[in-house]
Amino acid sequence: MNVFPKKIMLLGSGELGKEVAIAAKRLGCYVIACDRYNDAPAMQIADQFNVFNMNNGSELKEVIYKCNPDIIIPEIEALAVDVLKEIEQKITVIPNSRATATTMNRDKIRDLASNELNIRTAKFSYAVNQSELDLHAETIGYPLLIKPVMSSSGKGQSLVKNKNELAQAWNLAIEKSRGKSNKIILEEFIDFDLEITLLTIRQSNGKTLFCAPIGHEQKNGDYQCSWQPAELTESVLEKAQQIAKRVTDNLGGVGLFGVEFFIKGEEVIFSELSPRPHDTGLVTLISQNLNEFELHLRAVLGIPIPEIVCHEASASRVILASMETTDVAFTGLEQALSQSNTNVFMFGKPSSTEGRRMGVAVAKAETIDEARIKADNAAQSIQFINE
């Protein structure tokens, strides 16, 4: 018998962690939110919070043993994963420590997909210094993408059009890299037709479920807008589902995975994977009967998922800060919410820098184009001000 409430520890308390915390609280769980800074979004929902460096193994271990959670849900990449492997013998880690370690570094998940599972990816190579970068760039060809092997939200990513831009791209990737690695990945630029996320849910009963595909656009590797359902042929969707299942089956565990693909014609090209709710999946806050965070919690807790329904054409658009401040204030909610079937979710971040993601607008309509226009209008209505 599954006894509730469960005590859940979130390692990472940003906007996605906040929505996980909300979903957990609605199921009666006790939530402990952890992050490196105070008043992070999920901490505003949680029963308890801890502020510390989660990359520090001894600090992480101390907090885990002090709080003694039933379940640990990593929500960010920058973690002392060796501790999770040790802790996993006593406490459930979602989806598991291996999946967390594999997906926190682009090289590990890319090697798994391409080399072990023989799944089509963009051509890629690695470099640990400028000389290797120059050599591999000539082999892959221009234009190409350069990324840190470990970063989040597209930080440190550059599109390089010729060799004269390599040095600047290298410096940016190293500067924005998380952790101690100076390793970067060079990646073939694919002139794709569409970029999608396939939310893939592994359940404790052994079954895998899929949400309707989500189309999205990025700027410098960072999510800007998404829409659901993305228009795919039946054969392309089937290929994407097969690949997502192969990779997530290899990683194991339970929960929701965000699996990203490039679509070019009938070709499906694996891009990246997150073993947790995905930022592009914020559109499910309006599009589905169960949003991605609720699906994640149900899978984690062993609660049935009878069906996943995508109600109608829906879209999201991020709300970005226009200034740096520690006293966040904004206007425009009245205008943003004057449209039907539209909502705004502000994340409650305690400070902003120019371009920081502070919220998301979501909308639904009869068509994807109409939903995207409504979401765009709502997001543009929010203006940040100095009080």
From Swiss-Prot:
ATP-grasp domain residues: 111-301
Superkingdom in the source lineage: Bacteria
Keywords of this entry: ATP-binding, Ligase, Magnesium, Metal-binding, Nucleotide-binding, Purine biosynthesis
An example Gene Ontology CC term for this record: cytosol
Gene Ontology biological process terms from the UniProt entry: 'de novo' IMP biosynthetic process
Disulphide bond pairs: none
Catalysed transformations (reactions): N(1)-(5-phospho-beta-D-ribosyl)glycinamide + formate + ATP = N(2)-formyl-N(1)-(5-phospho-beta-D-ribosyl)glycinamide + ADP + phosphate + H(+)
Biochemical pathway: Purine metabolism; IMP biosynthesis via de novo pathway; N(2)-formyl-N(1)-(5-phospho-D-ribosyl)glycinamide from N(1)-(5-phospho-D-ribosyl)glycinamide (formate route): step 1/1
GO molecular function: ATP binding; magnesium ion binding; phosphoribosylglycinamide formyltransferase 2 activity; phosphoribosylglycinamide formyltransferase activity
Residues where ATP binds: R106, K147, S152, S153, G154, K155, G156, Q157, E187, E188, F189, I190, E195
UniProt-annotated binding residues for N(1)-(5-phospho-beta-D-ribosyl)glycinamide: E15, L16, E75, D279, K349, R356, R357
Positions annotated to bind Mg(2+): E260, E272
EC number, as in UniProt: 6.3.1.21
Family: Belongs to the PurK/PurT family.
Described purpose of this protein according to its UniProt entry: Involved in the de novo purine biosynthesis. Catalyzes the transfer of formate to 5-phospho-ribosyl-glycinamide (GAR), producing 5-phospho-ribosyl-N-formylglycinamide (FGAR). Formate is provided by PurU via hydrolysis of 10-formyl-tetrahydrofolate.
Subunit structure: Homodimer.
HAMAP family per UniProt: PurT
Protein's name according to its UniProt entry: Formate-dependent phosphoribosylglycinamide formyltransferase
Gene: purT
